[in-house]
């Protein structure tokens, strides 16, 4: 429901309350679910009207929504049960036990049995835990206090506990204002209008005639724009307030936490409308979770901690979450079959799959070496032997160890969540961080002398929205560092060497679990207040903790000193073991290793085999010995999709186990050339063709992955000799015929007399918006149906050329504009509700539902040439101008806040990076400027390097990579990739060979793995985004009608969720959509590493060479 509809409900509630329609008020509260009336709820609870209490609650939550809801319903039904027992109504008590309380037996059978046993007592107060139960009135009051705390901590009640501050009779006031406005529109207004009905618009009758025609639907040209325009508001839901942290989520683990120091302040996404009063008022309630995330104890911390950790069951201990709904699965989903075996050369001690690519594996070994493997190609891409980068930064103690030639091994390798960094921990003092942007670009970043003795574990986390690395070691400490090597926290408290760490966040609480070799588990917040937990792990020795992929379930696995292994699931809310998995062998020397997969499976390496469990079943599901050769306690690691499992072998190597999907991913680079010729796409050899190297495949229809494309591998590095399955040759994909890809021409576009100069997909992926050179915007929408259930844009289903019933067009103001010289520009709001555009005249804000102009601003001169919404505030827009300035404009107050000067010619591109906190601008002067978002001061200006003989003019466009660190620069003479943090060009491609025409447009695919590039001769190139190597060429003959000379694409747009779909706008006004065929699934084949030796399209020329 839209925000205005929500506000209307509040106005109706106020009206009903003022008119004393009491039952109607509470019924609307319940049915809308917008406002939970605590006063009404209190009255019903204290009166013991339990049916009314549960009926009212049902409008806001159900028993199994979350653990807070479950606890609320449990407390109510428990009180109802106890009161029946107190009245000696045993039959009623049995009815409540069977009908109301039985649902909780699923989650805690022991507790249900204990409650049942109360029936056998003459007075339930004989039970020790209920001995202090007083009279009914007192018990209800105590319970009500607990319910209030649970309701305030429950995220489902957030923003529903305070009624917005309204003036009395606000709905009547609005109606009166509407009537006054209608009266002003009357052609013959009477001095004392007679208002007889609200069912129709008001008009004044003529003295001797019929009613004057209503003017309400006619354009009102005399009304001025409101001073405080609620920008982008009428159809936009209120953005959620900052999520408040709930203590209950980790009550047992962190009961003594301090809300003030728990985690960073919330990042408040600026509202699209002025902040509603209820969101401001609710922050003032002392019991309501605060706007800044923190730990909020809804009970006394010490009492809560003791209650949670005591071993005896309690009537208050039912907070088990409801079972998660899992997708159907079968044993075939498990990677149990050996797919390949690779030789590392020394004992493998740690492995980790790249988070963005299923077949890239990082391996650490006992010699201190790390290796990056591309599994599909069986390639050892990069190896880095252990080496001290800077001895002067190491402690004297470490230098003394090195002088004794003490061997050093890798204890842990890890990827940062975004895949931009690799962390390596060693058995002596050090950790090393590498910056990673592809196998050919693994750079030394930071070396830290982190601990005295071994660094036993390493993990990445993002406290305070800053990437950090967390380490633990033999010195009994846990430390938190930023990636530059600066230490932020040191956590002391363990009495033994710390074995492992598990950083996590839940309900905006960021924390770290740690385990020591004495079996103690501790939990830490990012503060200096000490550990929140001191608890024993099963086995009381080396234990590792892991969360399921979705972060909702916590597991630990370890071994005792006697060699007994334990795998358990924890009940976080209680600080107790929920499930202990069975069928381990006894007395194995060493520590058992485990991993989780797809929120459903657990895998453990034990007794020379891999055992698998369903998370919901304590018995082994299946096991495999991977065709033999495994050590007694193998290390193992799943890839992100769970279709590959890396397992260490006893012969200094590792095996890859796969399920059917895993085998397909491994064959992605192995398909023989003879088989590739059977695909619908015609592959032709192109001498010296530019290539890409490593495929980050995203299946059609899969969720978009925030990822990077890997560039070419280094041919000089050692490789595995077994290459019989490798492709014998690689050929550039060339699409020459319409049958070789899916394509569609959007309806009502062919033969138009105007050019498509701007093209966008809607953010939902269900529509395309085109801006013509005449200033008119057109919208196409896909609707869900049997052929297209998702309702997303696709080339296989014809969309609707969408227009509102009014027949309005989205037409920009072009009065007095020379359209030949205009630079039309467009920007879409994040929620697809509004589009802002200009075509040489004023900037217009259009409602995407009605096509009505909501407001106009920034009249020329100078004309607007580029528009970009601020990523953190839709009310702030960066507007590039014809006179080379950039205006930072606030729509809400209709004011230019800053004017940026740094270019010499008109602005042609703008892009924001929230990661770097900068705005990047480009102009027709071939200059790129970097501006601080905080101060709007210019940081640097860079000229793009022009090829020899080319003039530095023409439009330059910029777009950030999804990592927000690299930026694509597009000019008719080149594609270039800049490192925005250093403001330096790192890669460049110049039109050449079959793609020698000037570039007309280019854009990243949604996952930034590909770059779609259009050329003025009609060719389209699909490039690998990291290496700028050509993967596929689409000829004009594949998508343009024959005989249309001079027809070419002017602009390209990429689908926001499907990385393999794009659209192009042509100079005849038509819009074409393109997708690879189902059989192919992607644009072009990934070349084997040998193809890297062919001439590259990436320009390695120096700036001086370019200018010669």
From Swiss-Prot:
Chain intervals with Polar residues compositional bias: 1091-1108
Residue segments, region Disordered: 706-725, 1084-1108
Subcellular location(s) of the protein: Nucleus
Ranges of residues in domain CTLH: 34-92
Residues with the Phosphoserine modification: 214
Cellular component per GO, a single term: nucleus
SUPFAM superfamilies: Quinoprotein alcohol dehydrogenase-like
Domain LisH residues, every copy: 4-36
Superkingdom of the source species: Eukaryota
Keywords, comma-separated and alphabetical: Jasmonic acid signaling pathway, Nucleus, Phosphoprotein, Repeat, Repressor, Transcription, Transcription regulation, WD repeat
Subunit field text: Tetramer. Interacts with NINJA/AFPH2. Interacts with SMXL6. Interacts with SPL (via EAR motif). Interacts with SPEAR3/TIE1.
Protein known as: Topless-related protein 3
């Amino acid at each position: 429901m839209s925000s205005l509809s929500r506000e209307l409900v509040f106005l109706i509630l106020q009206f009903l309350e003022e008119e004393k329609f009491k039952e109607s008020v509470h019924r609307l509260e319940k049915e809308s679910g917008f406002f939970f009336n605590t006063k009404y709820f209190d009255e019903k609870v204290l009166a013991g009207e339990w049916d009314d209490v549960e009926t009212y609650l049902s409008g806001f939550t159900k028993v199994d929504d979350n653990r807070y809801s479950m606890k609320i319903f449990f407390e109510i039904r428990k009180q109802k049960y106890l009161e029946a027992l107190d009245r000696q109504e045993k039959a009623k008590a049995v009815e409540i036990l069977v009908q109301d309380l039985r649902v909780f037996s699923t989650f805690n059978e022991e507790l249900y049995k204990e409650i049942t046993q109360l029936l056998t007592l003459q007075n339930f107060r004989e039970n020790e835990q209920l001995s202090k139960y007083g009279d009914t009135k007192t018990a209800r009051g105590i319970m009500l206090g607990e319910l209030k705390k649970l309701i305030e901590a429950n995220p489902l009640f957030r923003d529903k506990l305070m009624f917005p501050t309204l003036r009395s009779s606000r709905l009547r006031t609005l109606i009166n204002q509407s009537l006054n406005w209608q009266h002003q529109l009357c052609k013959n207004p009477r001095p004392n209008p007679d208002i007889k009905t609200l069912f129709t618009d008001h008009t004044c009758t003529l003295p001797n005639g019929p009613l004057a025609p209503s003017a309400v639907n006619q354009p009102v040209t005399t009304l001025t724009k409101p001073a405080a325009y609620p920008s982008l508001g009428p159809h936009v839901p209120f953005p959620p307030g900052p999520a408040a942290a709930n203590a209950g989520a980790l009550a047992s683990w962190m009961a003594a936490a301090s809300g003030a120091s728990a985690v960073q302040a919330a990042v408040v996404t600026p509202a699209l409308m002025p902040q509603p009063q209820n969101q401001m008022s609710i922050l003032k309630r002392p019991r309501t979770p605060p706007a800044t995330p923190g730990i909020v104890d809804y009970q006394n911390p010490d009492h809560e901690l003791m209650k949670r950790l005591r071993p005896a069951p309690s009537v208050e201990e039912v907070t088990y979450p409801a079972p998660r709904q899992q997708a159907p699965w079968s044993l075939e989903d498990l990677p149990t079959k050996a797919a390949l075996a690779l030789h590392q050369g020394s004992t493998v001690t740690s492995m980790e799959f790249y988070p963005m690519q299923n077949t890239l594996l990082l391996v650490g070994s006992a010699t201190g070496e790390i290796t990056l493997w591309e599994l599909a190609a069986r390639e050892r891409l990069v190896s880095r032997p252990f080496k001290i980068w800077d001895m002067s930064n190491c402690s004297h103690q470490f230098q003394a160890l090195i002088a004794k030639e003490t061997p050093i091994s890798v204890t842990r390798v890890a990827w940062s969540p975004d895949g931009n960094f690799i962390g390596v921990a060693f058995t002596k003092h050090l950790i090393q961080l590498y910056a990673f942007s592809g196998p050919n670009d693994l750079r030394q970043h930071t070396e830290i002398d982190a601990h005295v003795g071994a660094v036993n574990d390493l993990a990445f986390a993002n406290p305070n929205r800053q990437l950090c690395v967390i380490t633990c070691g033999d010195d009994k400490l846990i430390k938190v560092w930023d990636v530059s090597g600066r230490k932020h926290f040191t956590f002391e408290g363990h009495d033994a060497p710390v074995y492992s760490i598990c950083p996590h966040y839940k309900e905006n609480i960021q924390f770290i679990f740690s385990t020591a070799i004495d079996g103690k588990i501790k939990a830490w917040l990012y503060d200096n207040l000490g550990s929140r937990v001191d608890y024993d792990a099963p086995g009381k020795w080396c234990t590792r903790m892991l969360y399921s992929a979705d972060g909702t379930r916590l597991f630990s696995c370890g071994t005792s000193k006697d060699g007994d292994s334990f795998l358990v699931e924890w009940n976080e809310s209680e600080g107790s073991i929920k499930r202990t998995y069975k069928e381990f062998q006894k007395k194995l020397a060493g520590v058992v290793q485990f991993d989780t997969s797809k929120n459903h499976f657990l895998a453990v390496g034990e007794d020379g085999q891999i055992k698998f469990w369903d998370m919901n079943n304590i018995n082994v599901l299946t096991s495999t010995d991977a065709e033999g050769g495994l050590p007694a306690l193998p290390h193992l690691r799943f890839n992100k999709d769970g279709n590959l499992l890396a397992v260490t072998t006893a012969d200094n190597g590792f095996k890859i186990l796969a399920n059917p999907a895993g085998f397909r991913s491994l064959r992605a680079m192995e398909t023989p050339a003879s088989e590739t010729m059977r695909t619908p796409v015609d592959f032709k050899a192109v001498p010296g063709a530019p290539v890409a190297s490593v495929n980050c495949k995203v299946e059609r229809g899969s969720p978009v992955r925030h990822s990077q494309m890997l560039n070419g591998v280094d041919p000089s590095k050692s490789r595995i000799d077994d290459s019989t399955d490798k492709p014998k040759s690689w050929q550039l994909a060339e699409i020459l015929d319409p049958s070789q890809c899916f394509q569609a021409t959007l309806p009502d576009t062919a033969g138009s007399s105007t050019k498509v100069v701007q093209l966008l997909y809607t953010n939902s992926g269900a529509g395309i918006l085109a801006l013509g050179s005449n200033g008119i915007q057109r919208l196409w929408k896909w609707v869900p149906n049997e052929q297209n259930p998702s309702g997303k844009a696709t080339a296989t289903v014809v969309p609707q050329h969408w227009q509102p019933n009014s027949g309005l067009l989205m037409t920009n103001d072009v009065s007095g504009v020379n359209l030949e010289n205009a630079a039309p520009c467009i920007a879409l709001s994040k929620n697809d509700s509004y589009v802002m555009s200009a075509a040489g005249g004023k900037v217009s804000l259009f409602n995407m539902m009605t096509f009505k102009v909501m407001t106009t601003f920034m009249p020329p001169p100078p004309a607007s040439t580029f528009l970009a919404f601020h990523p953190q505030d839709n009310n702030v827009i960066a507007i590039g101008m014809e006179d080379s300035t950039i205006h930072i404009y606030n729509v809400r107050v209709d004011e230019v806040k800053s004017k940026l000067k740094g270019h010499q010619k008109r602005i042609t591109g703008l892009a924001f990076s929230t990661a770097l906190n900068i705005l990047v601008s480009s102009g027709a002067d071939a200059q790129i400027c970097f501006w601080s978002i905080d101060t709007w001061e210019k940081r640097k200006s860079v000229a793009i390097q022009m090829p020899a003989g080319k003039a530095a003019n023409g439009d330059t466009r910029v777009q950030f990579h999804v990592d927000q660190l690299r930026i694509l620069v597009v000019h008719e003479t080149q594609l270039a990739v800049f490192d925005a943090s250093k403001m330096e060009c790192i890669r460049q491609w110049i039109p050449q060979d079959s793609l020698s025409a000037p570039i007309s447009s280019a854009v990243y695919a949604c996952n930034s793995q590909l770059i779609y590039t259009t050329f003025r001769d009609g060719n389209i190139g699909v490039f690998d985004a990291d290496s700028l190597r050509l993967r596929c060429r689409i000829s004009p003959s594949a998508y343009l009608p024959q005989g249309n000379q001079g027809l070419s694409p002017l602009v390209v747009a990429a689908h926001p969720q499907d990385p393999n779909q794009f659209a192009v706008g042509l100079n005849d006004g038509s819009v074409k959509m393109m997708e690879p065929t189902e059989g192919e699934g992607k644009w072009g084949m990934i070349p084997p590493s040998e193809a890297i030796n062919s001439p590259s399209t990436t320009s390695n020329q120096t700036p001086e060479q370019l200018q010669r």
